[in-house]
Amino acid sequence: GRWRRRVGKALGSVLERRRFWERVLAGPVATQVFAGQEAHAELEIRRELKRATTVRSAGVGEVYIVGAGPGDPDLLTLKAARLLQQADVVLYDRLISEAVLDRARRDAERIYVGKEAGRHHVTQEQTQQLMIELALQGKRVCRLKGGDPFVFGRGGEELQALTAQHIPVTVVPGITAALGAAAYAGIPLTHRDHAHSVTFATGHAREGGAAPDWQELARPGQTVVFYMGLSQLPTIVAELTAAGARLDLPAAVIEHATLPEQRVIAGTLRDLAECVAAAQVRSPALLVVGEVVALRGEARAKEASRLTLPLAGENDRVKRA
């Protein structure tokens, strides 16, 4: 009763009060109350009310930049799912599945802002301006991005645009595609006998941008994951081998990672491009290069992976050197 009266006094409209209690009941306050941590809950609810009154006085909404993970809706974080339920508007990318969108509130407006190489339905600048305009209307905007928003997701640019307009922003990390793809394909990204580091690289550079450091990417004893590299696969292989990578170095392309239709095309730098072309692989797909790729084949041969890893089955195509 005490907090109900205090909230009613601080937040004048029914909508504002509803939003406040939604955040409280679905967030850490409720968890702390159930855990008997009433002092922590009291502090958290004070912070939440202060945040709500600050937003109210500014007359603006807020934006959640949310990583949706690599595809499987069960890989959404709890916080991502909670903010999806709170959002009035969801701006989503090309790689966001219907199963993930179904986690949003039923009455939330959905706006597609997808982009792909060479074909932008909406430009990045238009997306950023739309987020700003919606927030200035007092709406809660969920910017839903595949994987993690700060790993080749241009989330940093969106954060800069919003903070420049003094719009409240919450960033929610997601499982980046490399982690999800490797786990579901049974490929450890690091291994003390084979890879002491892992590098995430983009498969295509911005026009006029700096070229990748191929000597560094070809260095042995590491795993390299290329995002958005399917169309550049022959070039990537040629550059790596020219920089000293072995032709028999294991490599794999993972298509539609973590989804039921996932496929893994495995081979070596010598024959991978040919295998991928024969399998007619389509985007989205990741390229993994390193000795750890061979461990997947070992696990399958021992059938241990069937017991512990959600591997793609009939669609798998494995070619070993």
Protein language model features and the residues they cover:
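Short hydrophobic/aromatic-enriched beta-strand-loop microsegments
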Residues: 108-115, 166-170, 189-199, 244-253
